[in-house]
């Protein structure tokens, strides 16, 4: 089997240590978690004993890297002053929590411009990220900008948007990118065959730079190509399809990256079925 770091977004509702039991049963080599309930603004303190157990278990299971995903409510592109302020503070807090958990990355959605202009919205994200890095000056946690599907007023669905932000980040050692395959596809970057995959990642390399790519959110899409609709789907069963999903995880250019699945979890069989599919794909050879 090819040596690719794959894993899932793991639910922590049963506690941090329990989440790693789930990760182990799914053979995860890397994981993504929320550090708290993602549907609110409140931050319950991380319990010291739970954190210690989590870190010990991480070491035991050799799970790395760990990605902490920002909650759903923050919008670092928001024109609303109150929401923007809370979003920036959330980012700072999330970086501090990631550090406590020995997580390497904090993944953020670039956000929605609402009724603002694209340029204003992108500049807001730049300010938010620069502020958060400044406020966590001694941290090594890297902020990952995740591309979007371009749904509604979302920004960040074009590589040029991501480049605009990174160009204006003062400490470039603390910034990177997550590319979500479902979002790429919905935003008009084709991934269904070798030629399309090469074209998409060559374009990313030319505009943003592969050195900034730290993570792949490995999801099939339940919405059609260039639909600007964000709908994750089970691996190989969506519009990207079996061939595209297989080619993505066996593409040599991406083989050093963590592939994290954020596929639907409607039944207990969903994750194991997606795991099975990934393991089948990894029986193939890398291609270049």
Where in this protein do the model-derived segments appear?
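Acidic (Asp/Glu)-rich catalytic clusters
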Residues: 21-28, 47-67, 94-102, 133-139, ...
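Active-site acidic/histidine proton-transfer and metal-coordination neighborhood
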Residues: 60, 76-176
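Acidic/histidine-rich catalytic cores of soluble enzymes
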Residues: 131-233
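Conserved active-site loop/cleft motifs that coordinate metal ions or position small ligands
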Residues: 32, 214-217, 256-263
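N-terminal pre-domain/capping segments
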Residues: 1-70, 74-96, 284-288
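Conserved, mostly hydrophobic/aromatic
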Residues: 23, 69, 87, 98, ...
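Short, electropositive alpha-helical surface patch
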Residues: 82-95, 118-131, 158-167, 195-202, ...
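Active-site beta-loop-alpha junctions enriched in small/polar residues
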Residues: 9-13, 36-38, 71-73, 111-113, ...
């Amino acid at each position: 089997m090819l040596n690719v770091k794959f894993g899932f977004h793991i639910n922590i509702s049963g506690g941090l240590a329990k989440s790693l039991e789930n990760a182990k049963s799914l053979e995860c080599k890397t994981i993504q978690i929320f550090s708290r309930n993602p549907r609110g603004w409140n931050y319950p303190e991380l319990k010291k004993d739970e954190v210690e157990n989590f870190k010990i278990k991480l070491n035991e299971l050799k799970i790395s890297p760990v990605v902490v995903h920002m909650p759903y409510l923050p919008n670092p592109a928001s024109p609303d002053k109150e929401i923007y302020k809370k979003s920036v503070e959330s980012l700072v807090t999330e970086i501090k929590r990631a550090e406590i958990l020995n997580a390497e990355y904090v993944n953020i959605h670039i956000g929605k411009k609402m009724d603002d202009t694209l340029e204003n919205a992108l500049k807001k994200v730049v300010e938010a990220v620069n502020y958060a890095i400044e406020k966590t000056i001694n941290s090594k946690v890297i902020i990952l900008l995740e591309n979007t599907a371009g749904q509604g007023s979302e920004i960040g669905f074009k590589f040029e948007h991501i480049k605009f932000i990174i160009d204006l980040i003062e400490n470039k050692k603390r910034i990177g990118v997550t590319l979500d395959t479902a979002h790429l596809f919905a935003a008009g970057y084709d991934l269904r065959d070798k030629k399309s995959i090469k074209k998409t990642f060559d374009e990313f390399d030319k505009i943003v730079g592969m050195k900034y790519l730290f993570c792949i959110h490995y999801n099939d899409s339940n919405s059609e190509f260039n639909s600007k609709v964000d709908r994750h789907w089970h691996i190989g069963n969506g519009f990207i399809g079996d061939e595209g999903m297989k080619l993505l995880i066996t593409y040599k250019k991406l083989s050093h990256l963590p592939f994290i699945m954020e596929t639907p979890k409607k039944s207990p069989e969903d994750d194991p079925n997606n795991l099975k599919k990934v393991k089948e794909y990894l029986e193939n050879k890398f291609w270049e």
